[in-house]
A protein has these predicted regions:
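Alpha-helical substrate-recognition element adjacent to the catalytic core
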Residues: 2-5, 9-115
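C-terminal cap/substrate-recognition subdomain and adjoining C-terminal extension
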Residues: 94-185
Length: 185
């Protein structure tokens, strides 16, 4: 179904582009943001085959909300939804997301797959991710990009809906519901 004006956002499915830190990986305590997931669990993410920019093995404690992860997994499981990771975790992003409980299909695109953990600065991250996601939008895919570096809330421009989160609270329940709605669920 296409809404009046032919918005690309009226079709089911599309790209769900996720950062990890500040989106799925949260502060240990509730940030007091309306609608935030308040359950927290500490996960030690270990990717021993990789080294970070300091030549140390990748092994980091992160905090996640199991309830949020379950809700995001439901969005990833919607028909036609394609997961894209856009995180400075670089080559470790897929494994980090999986260890945190995220459903990461084999078809996932990790925009920074070949990059060392910590080697992607935020300006480069945003520019390179935007280039990739613009290609997706130009090919007719609906794109929803969630990152704590975006302006807070939901903004659509150039065929991409950006979702700005609080770096401490990450995705909130209402945000996940809106993302689900945008991707046809």
């Amino acid at each position: 179904m296409v809404s009046e004006g032919g918005s690309a956002l009226a079709r089911a499915g599309g790209v769900l582009a996720l950062d990890l830190d500040g989106v799925l990986f949260l502060s240990p305590e509730s940030a007091g943001v309306a609608g935030e997931y308040v359950d927290r669990r500490r996960v030690r993410v270990k990717v021993p085959r990789l080294r970070d920019v300091w030549e140390m093995r990748v092994s980091e404690p992160v905090w996640v909300s199991p309830s949020m992860i379950a809700d995001v997994n439901a969005v990833i499981g919607l028909p036609g939804v394609r997961l894209v990771l856009v995180s400075s975790w670089g080559a470790a992003a897929v494994e980090a997301a999986r260890q945190a409980g995220l459903m990461v299909p084999d078809s996932v695109v990790n925009v920074f797959e070949g990059r060392t953990v910590g080697a992607v600065n935020q300006d480069v991250k945003l520019a390179e991710a935007l280039t990739y996601l613009r290609e997706c939008a130009a090919a007719g895919e609906r794109v929803v990009w969630v990152d704590d570096l975006h302006v807070p809330g939901f903004v659509e421009h150039g065929g991409i809906v950006t979702v700005g989160t609080s770096e401490d609270a990450g995705l909130t329940g209402p945000m996940v519901a809106q993302v689900r709605s945008l991707l046809g669920g």
